[in-house]
Design a protein with these regions (language model features):
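Conserved, well-structured ligand/cofactor-binding cores
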Residues: 1-201
Length: 201
């Protein structure tokens, strides 16, 4: 697919010009989560009769493609923008609109048959959609990345508890020497603490 933002859409272009601060881009995980919000909104709007089925399917197809990371290059905006994330929300609305236009054989930027505001952003406020996307991205990050790493950490502590069971060290309490213990016991305590991450599930 060609680069949709060779000629940037209006809202995205304005944001790049108004917030030309550093180079920290919006995390792709957040973009993907926001695309899921757009997908869910389109389905709900269609069920309520607010959006016709054809446009719903076009938005859903484009949103899924974005959520799967197929169009990450189309999101050049920085994290430095207004606090509500309005610019990123509009960036995504414009990308989904253009993807739908392209799929329908219409020129990019035509906003036909899917308009960024009237259809992609239908029944949404950035003040709701963006925080919801943050929560979705956080849950996915915890589930897919953090929890598996914590499982590995717990296993590593268990292995060290066994490997270090004969190494005696002095305990420390309030920066003073305390009761001796083995390094294995200390590693075992770390392992016990690490099991608490299961509450995140």
């Amino acid at each position: 697919m060609s680069n949709i933002y060779k000629d940037l859409e209006a809202q995205t272009q304005r944001s790049l010009q108004n917030f030309a601060i550093a180079s920290d881009q919006m995390p792709a995980e957040l973009i993907h989560a926001l695309a899921r919000i757009k997908q869910a909104a389109a389905i709900t709007n269609a069920r309520l009769g607010v959006l016709d089925q054809e446009r719903c399917e076009q938005i859903v197809a484009a949103a899924i493609a974005v959520a799967e990371g197929q169009h990450d290059a189309q999101f050049p905006l920085r994290v430095w923008q207004t606090g509500s994330g309005t610019q990123t929300n509009m960036n995504l609305n414009e990308v989904i609109s253009n993807l739908a236009s392209q799929a329908a054989g219409e020129p990019l930027g035509s906003h036909h048959p899917v308009h960024p505001n009237d259809h992609v952003n239908c029944s949404q406020s950035t003040n709701d959609a963006f925080p919801a996307a943050i929560h979705v991205a956080a849950v996915e990050g915890i589930t897919r990345r953090l929890l598996p790493e914590l499982e590995c950490l717990q296993d590593a502590f268990a292995a060290k508890a066994t490997a270090w069971e004969t190494i005696v060290k002095i305990g420390r309490t309030h920066l003073q020497d305390a009761v001796p213990l083995t390094l294995g016991q200390e590693a075992s305590a770390w392992r016990a603490k690490s099991t608490r991450f299961r509450n995140l599930k």
